[in-house]
């Protein structure tokens, strides 16, 4: 399983360039976990694929002020759908390993827990199969290709429409974002 790695963002980049670097690192993390997630032999591959998608979706939200509205509208939906397709497999894995397993240790031989384990394993197998299907569908391949190409074609909205965000340095853009987030938690 491949965990998130540095996106290579540096202070000389514009906010849009930083978004591209982050988005490409997310796509690469997703692709590096794809074969393992499809095989279904280690649930960590699905987990790391979901981490990549979650990071990408967060980047889309954070960098929205410097992205074209149509770009966000189109791709946010597709990444959400893919995340949902993988979610059930991860949820069942977590339930079986982190919730049910401690109960089985506390109550060894409990017949109800054995039934729950058997049903949970069945659900996990079905969910893993659905995740594998999602990653082998043509629509997934098309999403990767279209999104990667669109990353290099996306243009920021007009400066007036975005409140000058694309004209900011990455440092000032980040400071503005952090300021907004800080106000949300006050």
Please report, for each region that a protein language model flagged, where it lies by residue.
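Cationic, histidine-enriched alpha-helical/coil surfaces that engage anionic ligands
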Residues: 1-186
């Amino acid at each position: 399983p491949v965990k998130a790695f540095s996106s290579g963002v540096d202070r000389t980049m514009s906010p849009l360039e930083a978004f591209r670097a982050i988005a490409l690192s997310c796509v690469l993390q997703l692709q590096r976990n794809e074969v393992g997630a499809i095989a279904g032999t280690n649930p960590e591959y699905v987990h790391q694929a979901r981490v990549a998608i979650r990071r990408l979706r967060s980047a889309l939200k954070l960098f929205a002020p410097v992205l074209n509205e149509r770009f966000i509208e189109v791709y946010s939906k597709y990444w959400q759908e893919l995340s949902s397709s993988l979610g059930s497999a991860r949820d069942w894995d977590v339930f079986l390993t982190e919730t049910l397993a401690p109960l089985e240790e506390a109550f060894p031989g409990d017949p109800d827990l054995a039934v729950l384990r058997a049903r949970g394993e069945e659900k996990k197998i079905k969910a893993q199969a659905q995740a594998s299907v999602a990653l082998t569908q043509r629509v997934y391949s098309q999403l990767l290709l279209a999104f990667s190409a669109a990353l290099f074609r996306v243009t920021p909205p007009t400066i007036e429409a975005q409140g000058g965000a694309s004209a900011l340095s990455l440092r000032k853009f980040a400071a503005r974002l952090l300021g907004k987030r800080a106000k949300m938690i006050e």
